[in-house]
């Protein structure tokens, strides 16, 4: 559903979108588990990897014009690879609904550091580096939520205290040696407490909500230093900013049909010196066929960058409501796509 969830997530996936939804469940739900949720996405819309290969190939052929053109094309490009997983155990309760959850995700970003202009473009290619940075975040927490009726209106409110362990990695490589596999060369780590919160209003199938994630901001410094690439020293060292993200959502959520929209109110600023800011708009739709098959589609776009929008499609299978297996794929371009799979069981 395009990654929406502020008003459309289930009580099992609520910790990852809006903890207030932990209190929204069916009367016959006694417990449930999400074991596991896995996803991966790849974004090389700038064709960084192809342009690195072009520059290396031209330099090896000793083709000066082609090398110079390849370096110019490579300048300003960026590539990203993200993947993650999650588990959750939900305990619906009319007093305080709870969901114990764990999550781990890794974000990798790479961009070139083009060497200064040189009369010899072959040497310029030898001196050019690819800088990479990665953050890995693992978190364990519990979502607690309560349903309330206020002035005749239906609300739920939720909090998710959690412990996070944050790892950062950096590397600097020549064009010829660059691989995303090399990204874990220099590592740092930090442990922190954080908090998510959310609220939901609903009236029949109509819903509106807001969520706040990582309400306690932190800045984590990566390792820094110099690496010799070709004939020059390349400096590295960045700061990863873990900042609050506020998202609003609205939707029509019925038994056999769902339509929802999410919008990030602010940008997520991540690594300094990398153009990796994120501010998402998401929209999604789901059609449920007799509670056995769910067909999903969606769209999302990063408003913080001049990038293409992404289409998503997925299917859920829930035979006899014993469990649910969901598979989804996303497509932006041949250079940017992703996939995910979820397995849920409720009792």
Name each model-derived stretch.
Residues 2-347:
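Subset of outer-membrane beta-barrel
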